[in-house]
A protein has these predicted regions:
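Hydrophobic alpha-helical transmembrane segments
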Residues: 1-69
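Membrane-embedded alpha-helical segments of integral membrane proteins
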Residues: 159-228
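Juxtamembrane "helix-exit" motif on the non-cytosolic side of transmembrane helices
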Residues: 35-46, 100-113, 162-171
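Secretory targeting signals
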Residues: 86-146
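Juxtacatalytic substrate-recognition/specificity segment
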Residues: 270-323
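Internal/C-terminal transmembrane anchor helices
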Residues: 230-262
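Central hydrophobic cores of alpha-helical transmembrane segments
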Residues: 147-161, 242-247
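Helix-loop-helix units of permease transmembrane domains in multi-pass membrane transporters
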Residues: 56-96, 100
Length: 323
């Protein structure tokens, strides 16, 4: 009986060791479990929804990316595709740890819409963790050493998030899309947060970016050294150049259309979409010319100018130019 019990306990342990073969990956698994457990006692985050998904995406994307950047790639005869699939499988296992904990917590806290929560988890933390694992792997391939690889991934992570923070602070939109975070809604009310086409287009763009990275790195990968060698550029076949060219074209197309697809909107994009402009010496009004006539826009501009004068002492301008 004791032997049977030991064998029963050994099987899950072996599964865990196979799924998370390195010490770093097991530590990350424990940290993700701790994060999900902490969320289980925080109101609003203790169910499977947008908010818990956002928290797990931030933590999971960073940790899994760092894991893949720090874990060495063993020199083998395996193709790069096999290594990528192995890292994806590991990332998928790690992403499932918080999911299982939050699903179990549903026995304690009622989920309003479990299917919506699963959908948010799929396009949020699950996609983020899988994508971060590949950028971490790319950092390891290019950095070669553990220290350089970690610094490369951290630099990419900080630059990507920093760019979105700057855009968030300087441009009109109050939302942001990020490969390592997912979707920051900016909305206060749950009813306004939904999975819409811009988020799906954004995730498609993430996949295309990774496709370009793979198309460039794959021909340069040397399996027996587990390294990238630029000297292999001379041996790249025309078909491989063509695949890389198509990937560049796809990335360029999606990047150029990002504003119109709705996931990278700036002031110029909004002005172009609205179409109508009216101004005086104090206010520049941009309006939707498909729903507002020029006469109505003139009345709005007049009213806003009057309100601005009410806010200013003695009706004088601020000296800061048009608002």
């Amino acid at each position: 009986m004791a032997d049977r019990f030991k064998r029963g306990m050994t099987s899950p342990v072996r599964l865990l060791v196979r799924a998370l073969p390195t010490r770093t990956s097991r530590i990350v698994g424990a940290l993700l479990a701790a994060t999900a457990s902490a969320l289980c006692v925080i109101p609003g985050f203790n169910v499977l929804n947008y908010y818990s998904g956002l928290a797990i995406a931030v933590v999971g994307g960073l940790l899994v990316g760092l894991t893949n950047a720090s874990d060495p790639i063993q020199p083998t005869r395996a193709r790069l595709r096999t290594i990528i699939l192995g890292r994806l499988a590991q990332a998928l296992f790690l992403a499932c740890i918080p999911l299982v904990i939050l699903l179990l917590n549903a026995f304690r806290v009622t989920n309003c819409d479990l299917m919506a929560g699963l959908s948010f988890y799929a396009v949020g933390p699950l996609a983020t963790i899988l994508i971060a694992s590949q950028w971490g792997l790319a950092a390891r391939l290019l950095g070669q050493t553990r220290q350089r690889s970690i610094l490369a991934f951290l630099g990419l992570w900080l630059a990507w998030i920093g760019s979105d923070v700057i855009s968030f602070l300087t441009e009109p939109p109050i939302f942001a899309y990020n490969a390592f975070v997912g979707f920051f809604s900016g909305a206060v009310y749950d009813d306004l947060i939904r999975i819409d086409p811009p988020l799906l287009f954004f995730r498609l763009g993430n996949l295309v970016q990774l496709g370009l990275l793979l198309a460039v790195v794959s021909p340069l990968f040397v399996a027996h050294r587990a390294a990238i060698e630029l000297s292999r550029l001379r041996t790249v076949r025309p078909l491989q150049w063509a695949v890389a060219g198509v990937a560049v074209l796809c990335v360029g197309t999606l990047t150029g259309a990002a504003g119109y697809l709705g996931y990278d909107i700036d002031r110029e994009t909004i002005q172009a979409q609205l179409g109508g402009t009216l101004s005086n010496d104090q206010i520049v009004l941009f309006y939707d010319q498909s729903t507002i006539t020029p006469e109505e826009a003139a009345l709005i501009l007049e009213d806003q100018t009057f309100r601005l004068h009410q806010l200013q002492p003695h009706g004088r301008g601020t000296g800061c130019g048009p608002t």
